[in-house]
Amino acid sequence: MMDLEGYVRRCLRKKIPENKIIEDGFKRILEIKEDVDEEFAKKFIKAILEEVKTTEKFREIDDENLKTLLKYPKSGVTMGRMGVGSRGEGDFFVHREIARIVKSTKVKAYVSAEEQDDAGIVRADAKYIVAAIDGTHSRLSDFPFLGGFHVTRAALRDIYVMGAEAVALISDVHLADDGDVGKIFDFTAGICAVSEAVNVPLIGGSTLRVGGDMVIGDRLVSAVGAIGVIKEGEPTARRNAEVGDVILMTEGSGGGTITTTALYYGWFDVIYETLNVDFIKACQNLIRSGLIKKIHAMTDVTNGGLRGDAYEISKTAKVSLIFDKEKVYKTINPKVLEMLEVLNIDPLGVSTDSLMIICPEEYADDIKKVTGAIEVGYVEEGEESYLVDGNKKIPLKPMFRESAYTPVKKVVGERKPGDFEEMKEKVRRACDEAIKKKDFVVELLKERKKKF
């Protein structure tokens, strides 16, 4: 394992010449990634170097608040030296400090993180229990507050689009051996900012090192989970979309993906646009007003952008979603849209974090009032989604990868590999082997159970 971004960042801070960084990084890529050629390796390391240089420019901006947001508090103590994850005195101390951040939110749980128990508890009545977990955006490792903030929103969105009210959050954070402990606190503070804003407690989690003693560097790898409940009514799952429904969307300002684009292209002021909990508030309004019961399906525009979500809904619900391009573009925050268009990034292929609501037409006006959504399309018979642009009706299909939204992603590209079908067959076989192993162990457990 090698953290290329961390390597380049450290080299720049040590004033190592750029040609030396490229030369050494190029060799390391070829050494570790056996399936790439020299041309790709050189382009790749150059793109990483340019990205890191761009993000480092935030230290020169005049906006002190934004600068503080992007920096994390440095303790000068690494994960390894403090013994984090080693289940001793240093580890216990760090966990008590994490609990102190959680306590500062004043969002109550029945058994909270500050009690240092093995699990947290909240009280809830439920007809259905809904759970989701989201991984932190990989490129926000050096911006842990933003990473924690946006992954928490992502997990909560996944709960709310099912028609559930969130009742608890959990977190999992791994920081490599040389990472400053302050990164963990900054990440947790990002989670807790959302927790406090929407009144959902962070009740537990796990804190370890990436690879223990075996991985050096300061890479942060993390996730946040959310638990929600549906007290009455039915889930608003994608499969429930019906012919004749209308499609509404709220304004989306993006989350981790848009933040990453802003950071790695130097559009730092766009980051402010992403700092909101509008999506969650809109969903809470739907639940508390009772209008959630009138909605057939909801989703967040994230997975491969509108292209990906529309495609998946069509396949799952076996209906055709028809979108008006001009109206869809009105649901993208103007500053975010400007950035995407200037950088030649397809706005329909990235996560904009709009709330998409599919409902009967007779309830649309009431739903618009409590969410701020606008009507962008409708559902008809068929199994493919389309974008209407003037007289043109364009199929909405996802690319092999989402729109390339950083310089490195533009090097990697969006095109499907030529041997993709062969790759799928190999992946299927690996999955089959995993199922066989699971079945073997289940039988083993059944045999052992008979001894009692």
Curated annotation (Swiss-Prot):
SUPFAM superfamilies: PurM C-terminal domain-like (SSF56042), PurM N-terminal domain-like (SSF55326). InterPro entries: Ni_metllenz_mat, PurM-like_C_dom, PurM-like_C_sf, PurM-like_N, PurM-like_N_sf, ThiL-like. GO terms for molecular function: thiamine-phosphate kinase activity. It comes from the Archaea. It holds the Pfam family AIRS. GO terms for biological process: thiamine biosynthetic process. Belongs to the HypE family. This is Uncharacterized protein MJ1416. It comes from Methanocaldococcus jannaschii (strain ATCC 43067 / DSM 2661 / JAL-1 / JCM 10045 / NBRC 100440) (Methanococcus jannaschii). The lineage of its organism: Archaea, Methanobacteriati, Methanobacteriota, Methanomada group, Methanococci.
